């Protein structure tokens, strides 16, 4: 949501990513095994493993960690007059409160909010086809 978050919900993910990076493992199997020491959702592990190849992460873990507060931050913007799609997981705490809906409505007055009922925050990984279908429907 276009909303500043104050809590770090990804601390264990960062611990897992750094553990793999520091172990200097080459294989995806060993990397996933290390991640399981920190993470208990296999779907999250497998999603993150898509970005691990030849013994390294395809994204900059250090930069993400060092700038995590910037990622959580959001400056309220002037209303955007463009039609905008937000897709949320029905089981996610993101885009779930009156405060979130109000922030979206104020900044994106033409927003459409879709829900993928049986998905959490990682809906793009959990219910990929449903997310793709909703995006296609919106764009058509």
Residue positions per predicted region:
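Short, solvent-exposed loop/turn segments at secondary-structure junctions
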Residues: 2-3, 91-93, 120-121
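Conserved serine/cysteine hydrolase catalytic core
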Residues: 54-108, 112-115
């Amino acid at each position: 949501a276009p909303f500043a978050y104050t809590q770090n919900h990804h601390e264990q993910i960062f611990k897992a990513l750094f553990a793999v990076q520091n172990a200097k493992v080459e294989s995806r199997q060993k990397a996933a095994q290390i991640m399981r020491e920190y993470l208990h959702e296999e779907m999250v592990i497998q999603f993150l493993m898509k970005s691990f190849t030849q013994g390294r992460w395809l994204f900059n873990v250090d930069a993400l960690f060092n700038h995590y507060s910037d990622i959580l931050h959001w400056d309220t913007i002037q209303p955007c007059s463009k039609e905008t799609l937000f897709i949320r997981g029905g089981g996610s705490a993101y885009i779930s409160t009156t405060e979130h809906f109000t922030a979206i409505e104020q900044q994106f007055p033409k927003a459409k909010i879709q829900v993928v009922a049986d998905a959490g925050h990682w809906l793009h990984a959990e219910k990929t086809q449903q997310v793709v279908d909703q995006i296609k429907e919106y764009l058509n």
